Amino acid sequence: GLKSLRTDTYSGRMYQKLLAHHISVYSAHTNLDSADGGVNDVLARLLGLTDLKGLVPVAEDKLYKIAVYVPESHGDAVRQALADAGAGYIGNYSDCSFTAKGEGRFKAHEGTHPFIGEIGQVEKAAEERIETIVPESKLRQTVQAMLVAHPYEEPAYDLYPLKNAGHPFMMGRVGTWPTPEPAMDVLKKIKGLLHRDALSYAGDTDVIVRRVALLGGGGAGFIKLAKDAGAQLYLT
């Protein structure tokens, strides 16, 4: 973060001009730092790290359960729509859902266009209750996809917030270096991979590096997390 404002530096002059012209700046670089496939994943792949784990917890994509009641004739269509929208993922499994059969009852009033039954009469319908899990980031699109696939004019559905752990968004990565070797050799390889003329480093260059932590940007405040994660070298 910004710790001083000096006009004799490049960044200081930039801030001075922004303030003088009443310009607000919103920088979303942290989004790329913590996104799956973002800056840190790109760096980790470039360095050849494997067995990757996140370093700094940032947020969690909370989980919801959606339960929808649908006539048996359209159960498969609604299940497919939910899956296509991103619902139903549990670990490395997709298209996860549960179905229970039952009887739905309703009475349509004037001005409605019921898919089943007549206006003014209580109708019984053979229905399925379809349940599946969906992350908050895909909740809106999942509900919309379900509504499009559902034949009813007014589908009945429930949304339940869950206490299950959702997908974590993490800044930084910790991974296994391809071959255990002295830190100085690792630094030389990193310098070449990143096409740098020089690297600044501190610490014992003879230590054998097996795990490497990295965090794009200024990550000096997370050195302890890197050490606790088992890294012998921290790149930031």
Where are these regions (language model features)?
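Hydrophobic structural segments
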Residues: 1-236
